């Protein structure tokens, strides 16, 4: 397997790679504006990773509630609140705190989520939908996207905004730390269904896995305790998909600080996901037939940078453009 150059306006250099030892990205684009000074977003919080709060509902009761019907769950919750009268003042105080936080400094009204969504849709309809009748007319007939994109659920890294994808251009899957698990028909059927639909039915030509800076999921992966203990119901088990990336980074970057190791793992975890894509038979078939290409990317929203690298599988040598 060789690292292929990306046929785009990016600066390209040839490189060789293997799934066991992925190389550094071979394409780089700096998306910065020297005329503006962009500060680091104030919402980035440096808090403990996967720190589970003390549960109001004990783990055994939580598991039992997960198996209940909607009506049973409501009844159980009402019973819990009636038995734990001390929760009332706590809940009221928390509501007051949230309300105070949502008040802006100029004393305007609290944030209204319904009004926010209504205003957002009105803007979309008047500024985009009604101004592009040809586009949305075609989309009403079906979709034929060129890209399938795996991106993180992080609210700061929407791929449609970052890469300016228009409606109908990208079939997007978002999850914690933009992970792609290996083929598993029972454990990760949701991801498998998305890949199968994109490759076999939508006939996408590119699958792109995009990591990003300051990823909490990757920080959590790098912080997993060595004894295997867990404090969450789902998150830690999910990010363990990237354990090969963690092991590689800790082995090759032992002299680096934790923050730099996390940055390296953000990119290495993308390579692990690209490798996992090869465990899907229809992905391998697409690569052999050259109807499908795999690409990895990393979006640095702190510095305004984007790296892109490609993988090509076959007998032909890689090319540089």
From Swiss-Prot:
Domain of life: Eukaryota
CDD domains: beta_CA_cladeB
EC number: 4.2.1.1
Keywords: Chloroplast, Lyase, Plastid, Transit peptide, Zinc
Zinc in keyword set: yes
Transmembrane helix among keywords: no
Transit peptide limits: 1-100
Entries under InterPro entries matching the protein: Beta_CA_cladeB, Carbonic_anhydrase, Carbonic_anhydrase_CS, Carbonic_anhydrase_sf
Cellular compartments per GO CC: chloroplast stroma
Molecular function GO labels: carbonate dehydratase activity; zinc ion binding
Biological-process GO terms, alphabetical: carbon utilization
Subcellular location: Plastid, Chloroplast stroma
Catalytic activity: hydrogencarbonate + H(+) = CO2 + H2O
Subunit architecture: Homohexamer.
UniProt family annotation: Belongs to the beta-class carbonic anhydrase family.
Record function comment: Reversible hydration of carbon dioxide.
Protein name stated in the entry: Carbonic anhydrase, chloroplastic
Organism: Nicotiana tabacum (Common tobacco)
